[in-house]
Amino acid sequence: MADTLMSDTPFWQRKTLDEMTDAEWESLCDGCGQCCLHKLMDEDTDEIYFTNVACRQLNIKTCQCRHYERRFEFEPDCIKLTRENLPDFEWLPMTCAYRLLAEGKPLPTWHPLLTGSKAAMHGERISVRHIAVKESEVRDWQDHILNKPSWAE
């Protein structure tokens, strides 16, 4: 009976992030693309500012990396979120499954692991599909800061 209950319970509810396989870890990503938007850091305060400027490898329509398996070859500054460095990424969106599970919170109802597709996530406008712009179209990066400080107004 206990084995049946274990197998009926989704892995993200019965395992810690450290206990997950690499495939389980990867499947937690909802594919919103928020990690793939460029961030700017204030050199004086180390504060991070979010932009709507997409990485060159991000397909804005699908919110997927064009070269995910080889992304570090194309974008050396691409982030690699791991179990070990997760605490360093305080800027992760409040909707991020990695963040939520690390904080002991459930996955949102629109998460692809619960719905079986990314449609609900896109419908909730969680993905960057509706706000992202191509890096090649950007002239002044400050015009694309989403959480503008007073000095950038």
Swiss-Prot record:
InterPro entries associated with the record: Puta_zinc/iron-chelating_dom, UCP006173
UniProt cross-references to NCBIfam families, sorted A to Z: PRK05170.1-1 (NF003498), PRK05170.1-5 (NF003501), PRK05170.2-1 (NF003503), PRK05170.2-5 (NF003507)
Signal peptide (residue range): none
Family to which this protein belongs: Belongs to the UPF0260 family.
Membrane-crossing segments per the record: none
Pfam family, any one: CxxCxxCC
Protein's name according to its UniProt entry: UPF0260 protein YcgN
